[in-house]
């Protein structure tokens, strides 16, 4: 497939990852359509013959099936990148039924409707940080899936259904198990993203509450590296359909806080620490498959990535 000749649909185009992806794809002159429940952010390129925006929620795909068919046909949509979700990880624990309905069932309907209306390939943004559980060794794509929260379980179920539907309807699918993305364009006053949240709280002397062990490790990926992983996935024609996408490195929460303290020249205020959760295990992703199959590799190390994010915030 030549992505330059076929249209690409992105859901969740107004989000952090969506905006970065759209900017890259418009620059490459790839015909592009974005679905989002919000209007197009002013920070994105102007709409054009090659960049279209629809206020359309994937939750409504069955109710608006005729409109979906017309959009897919009009823009020759052959590939869909599904970023949109209705749930943050921390919210899913108290909203299991809503999570299942909106982030499993609605996805199944959306995928089926897309394949049946001419789409050939769906790339799904899964979660490398929540589908595996925790360990002190890197997770490969073939390891057992042991999600500990509903958010991770819904990702696992969606991956499985996507693979099944693609096979049944002669389509292709890719699930990218993404670590913790961060970088330029990310809100630091939001509810998502450890690095921007820590930057905001340390900058403003707001206490940081630690849930779990402060020695637990996480994998963080800079947004430009993540965008390139999606671009490689657009062109990929191989047989693998699941890829871990991370930095290949990990850092403890304690070390991350110390790093940000040094860069801001401010001490963090540590508030609540959960004394029950003392397990220092965390999430480290083995990214060798993505490097070998997609021809992709991360290029931004964490220290430089945090510098880039801080600089972008100060330039606003």
UniProtKB/Swiss-Prot annotation:
Family: Belongs to the NAD(P)-dependent epimerase/dehydratase family.
Database matches in Gene3D superfamilies: NAD(P)-binding Rossmann-like Domain (3.40.50.720), UDP-galactose 4-epimerase, domain 1 (3.90.25.10)
Catalytic activities: dTDP-alpha-D-fucose + NAD(+) = dTDP-4-dehydro-6-deoxy-alpha-D-glucose + NADH + H(+); dTDP-alpha-D-fucose + NADP(+) = dTDP-4-dehydro-6-deoxy-alpha-D-glucose + NADPH + H(+)
Listed name of the protein: dTDP-4-dehydro-6-deoxyglucose reductase
Active-site residues, record numbering mapped to chain: 151 (proton acceptor)
Highest taxon above the source species: Bacteria
Entry binding sites for NAD(+): 16-17, 155
Entry's Gene Ontology molecular function annotations: dTDP-4-dehydro-6-deoxyglucose reductase activity; monosaccharide binding; NADH binding; NADPH binding
Regulation: Inhibited by Cu(2+), while other divalent cations such as Ca(2+), Co(2+), Fe(2+), Mn(2+) and Mg(2+) have no obvious effects on enzyme activity.
Residues of the signal peptide: none
Influence of temperature on activity: Optimum temperature is 15-37 degrees Celsius. Active over a broad range of temperatures, from 4 to 80 degrees Celsius.
Organism (species): Escherichia coli
Name of the coding gene: fcf1
Effects seen without this gene: Cells lacking this gene produce semirough (SR-type) LPS with only one O unit attached to the core-lipid A moiety while the wild-type strain produces normal LPS.
Function: This is a step in the biosynthesis of D-fucofuranose, a component of E.coli O52 O antigen. Is more efficient using NADH than NADPH as cosubstrate.
């Amino acid at each position: 497939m030549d992505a330059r000749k076929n249209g690409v649909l992105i859901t969740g185009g107004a989000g952090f990852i969506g905006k970065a992806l759209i900017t890259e794809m418009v620059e490459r002159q790839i015909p592009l359509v974005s679905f989002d429940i919000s209007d197009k952010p002013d920070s994105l390129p102007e709409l054009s013959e090659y960049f279209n925006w629809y206020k359309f929620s994937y939750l409504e795909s069955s109710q608006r099936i005729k409109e979906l068919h017309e959009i897919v046909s009009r823009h020759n949509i052959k590939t869909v990148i599904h970023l949109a979700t209705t749930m943050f990880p921390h919210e899913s624990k108290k909203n299991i039924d809503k999570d299942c309905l909106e982030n499993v069932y609605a996805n199944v309907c959306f995928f089926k409707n897309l394949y049946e209306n001419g789409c050939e390939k769906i790339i799904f943004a899964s979660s490398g940080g929540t589908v595996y559980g925790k360990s002190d060794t890197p997770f490969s794509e073939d390891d057992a899936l042991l999600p500990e929260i509903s958010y991770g379980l819904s990702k696992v179920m969606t991956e499985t259904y996507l693979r099944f539907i693609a096979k049944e309807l002669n389509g292709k699918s890719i699930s990218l198990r993404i670590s913790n993305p961060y970088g330029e364009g990310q809100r630091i006053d939001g509810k998502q993203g450890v690095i921007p949240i820590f930057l905001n709280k340390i900058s403003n002397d707001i206490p940081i509450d630690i849930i779990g062990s402060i020695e637990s490790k996480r994998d963080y990926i800079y947004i430009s590296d993540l965008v390139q992983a999606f671009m490689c996935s657009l062109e990929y024609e191989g047989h693998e359909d699941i890829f871990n996408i991370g930095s290949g490195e990990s850092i403890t929460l304690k070390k991350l806080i110390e790093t940000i303290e040094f860069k801001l020249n401010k001490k963090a205020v540590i508030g609540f620490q959960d004394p029950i959760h003392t397990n220092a295990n965390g999430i480290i992703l083995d990214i060798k498959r993505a490097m070998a199959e997609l021809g992709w590799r991360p290029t931004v190390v964490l220290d430089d990535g945090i510098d880039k994010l801080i600089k972008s915030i100060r330039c606003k």
